[in-house]
Amino acid sequence: MYAKNTWEKYKDQLNEVFDYNEGYKHYISKNKTERACVKDSIKLAEEKGFKPLESFDTLKSGDKVYVTNRGKNIALFIIGKKPLTEGMRILGAHIDSPRMDLKQNPLYESEGFTLADTHYYGGIKKYQWVTIPLSLYGVVCKKDGTVVDVVIGEDENDPVVGISDLLIHLSADQLDKKAAKVIEGENLDVTLGNMPLFGEEKDAVKANVLKLLKEKYDIEEENFVSAEIEVVPSGKARDYGLDRSMVAGYGHDDRVCAYTSLTAILDSDVSEYTSCAILVDKEEIGSVGATGAHSLFFENTVAELLLKMGIDSFVQTRLTMSRSKMLSSDVSAGVDPLFVNVNDKKNAAYLGNGIVFNKYTGSRGKSGSNDASAEYVAQVRAVMDNANIHYQTAELGRVDQGGGGTIAYILGNYNMDVIDAGIAVLNMHAPMEIVSKVDVYETYQAYKAFLKDA
């Protein structure tokens, strides 16, 4: 009863759908790390009149504010007409995606090649990440405080790197292995070069790679100890399908919900309640650490907002959180016509049918789930129906088939109402994921409606 084809809704407004997705394609094509997402989000926010919190002495209704954390989180606010202590309307997405990270001592030479040791980040099917073009993104931090940005493999004139695989002719033993073991995690090593530094006798190929890095970035091998270099798929997001109805790209999980959340608040006016969009890191590995959703960053930021309103109270900070309502902006598993047996089809998400609401996620008995209350689900339904938003409800696959989690339960621990709401994705956690353009646009509209009317 909730599955409505959303293309029909926009059949006379296709230009709006496609134009919005051009902006999204540009965003994910240039922002393949959490640091890049934050940097670009600041730029977009400032163009819309948002200012850093430290530039305000006091805050009033209508003020547009942003706060960042270690270059990996950003929280944006439009101060509402009602007192902040009456709660916020929050959109929360994550901007980290599955990938591989260079180890702290990554470089070595073997059989005439220079390679870089990696440790994969998040849940991946390791065999999907070999024999494809890869890029290197990140920062190298030197002892003197200098931070060097590194991007190799994205400019059309750049070289790319990659991970090799065994030729089919010699794969008899490999093909007998289970899929989880076909490519071992310790063998996800990136090939960086094959040419020696002429005149060098020991590790000459490695020496040549280090020479090139020194020339371009002025970095030494020891600097990798204090570096964060991420290995990600190369290339831009592309239209997918002969009808151009979908977007193929890296990092839809969860940058598609990050972008729609970001643009929803940037395109919103002042509402009754304070609007908020927060983009966090580390969701793919448990939302841990100083930049994950478990961090006190968000709570501290709310306390600082209240302080600039003349309220210095731990109790009021906690009550503000408790009185808030949130959409955990995260993707859902779309039904794949080639793998329909993993879904309960009447409780599944379909590409082209609008935003997806997951009352609960988790796995095997709802373990680790937020499980939104029926009362809150009804409130969200009313907001969506009043705004003529196409939405669907889903679970993450059949019972006991697997499962997954989001940041919903973390904010729910503050006693606020939270429900997962996002976009159906195919190929989730693969180097190339797929979303429907009309779902992207409808989710943007849904997020705006939530900020305005929830």
Q: Residue ranges of each PLM-predicted region?
A:
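N-terminal hydrophobic/helix-forming segments and targeting peptides
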Residues: 1-454
